């Protein structure tokens, strides 16, 4: 790549993202930290790897570990979902954002964000507290751990995860706003530089989803700073901790997070059996647009997309 001029470099990057799910994959030469594969290819490879780890536990009709799990499931039916965000790799306006995400190997957190079966996701959440490193899903034990998340999301191995929660907030804000703001006082999300406004939308839906409290906003800014500085972060641990914390929340007003990712992790291991009464899949990834697009949505203190 060293002999490429800048214009050809841009064309190469745009092409490699636009060809992820097309037929040209074997022809492009760009070396990425993460090999780009179609979702079908990912399914075939991962199911082959996990074929010997999915243990049967009863029949398809066994949806809950015990009565307590059944009770939890019923309460989960009263709660909605935070559908994750997706980026269109063909959108040239997202070039800078894709580069940042690809540099840390998190490309698949914004790609292949497919619809999910609500009942299966709720069953997973209700059952996971009763098993170590996995959950019962309709008569089978599916694995769920930080290492499994990283493996299935094709996240590069991280030996020592950067402690992003310790990032100095003022330093993060100064960097992400290009010096327009020096700290939390007077800070507004619209002060973020354009690529970082898009990155914030990714963060609030796909990395640190949840209520838009000041505490959560600060956490997102710290994580974004670490990401833009190409710090190595254990994505699997990041997601795992949030999912486990979610299983302890009983507030019916709190939406369930990571539904697309949870369902994807299950499907990548083994097709979840469908049962009578299952709804059609819902919640295809919400498109996140570049800042110049008409679809970028309302802007304000707390919402960017």
Task: Give short role names for the model-derived ranges.
Residues 2-300:
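A structural signal for long, well-ordered, hydrophobic/aromatic- and basic-residue-enriched core segments
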């Amino acid at each position: 790549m060293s002999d490429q001029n800048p214009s050809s470099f841009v064309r190469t990057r745009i092409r490699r993202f636009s060809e992820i799910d097309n037929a040209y994959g074997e022809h492009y030469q760009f070396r990425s930290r993460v090999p780009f594969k179609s979702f079908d290819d990912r399914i075939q490879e991962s199911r082959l790897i996990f074929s010997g780890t999915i243990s049967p536990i009863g029949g398809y009709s066994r949806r809950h570990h015990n009565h307590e799990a059944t009770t939890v499931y019923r309460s989960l039916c009263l709660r909605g979902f935070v559908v994750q965000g997706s980026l269109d790799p063909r959108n040239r306006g997202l070039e800078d954002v894709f580069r940042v995400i690809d540099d840390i190997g998190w490309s698949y957190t914004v790609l292949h964000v497919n619809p999910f079966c609500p009942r299966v996701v709720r069953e997973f959440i209700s059952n996971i507290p009763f098993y170590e490193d996995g959950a019962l899903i309709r008569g089978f034990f599916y694995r769920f751990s930080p290492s499994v998340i990283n493996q299935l999301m094709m996240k590069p191995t991280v030996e020592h995860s950067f402690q992003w929660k310790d990032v100095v907030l003022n330093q993060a804000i100064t960097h992400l706003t290009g010096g327009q703001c020096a700290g939390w006082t007077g800070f507004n999300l619209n002060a973020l530089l354009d690529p970082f406004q898009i990155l914030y939308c990714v963060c609030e839906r796909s990395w640190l989803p949840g209520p838009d409290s000041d505490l959560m906003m600060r956490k997102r800014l710290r994580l974004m700073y670490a990401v833009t500085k190409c710090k190595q972060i254990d994505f699997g641990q990041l997601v795992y901790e949030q999912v486990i914390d979610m299983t302890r929340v009983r507030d019916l007003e709190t939406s369930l997070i990571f539904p697309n990712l949870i369902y994807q992790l299950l499907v990548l291991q083994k097709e979840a059996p469908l049962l009578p009464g299952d709804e059609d899949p819902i919640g295809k990834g919400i498109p996140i647009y570049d800042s110049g697009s008409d679809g970028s949505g309302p802007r304000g203190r707390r919402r960017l997309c």
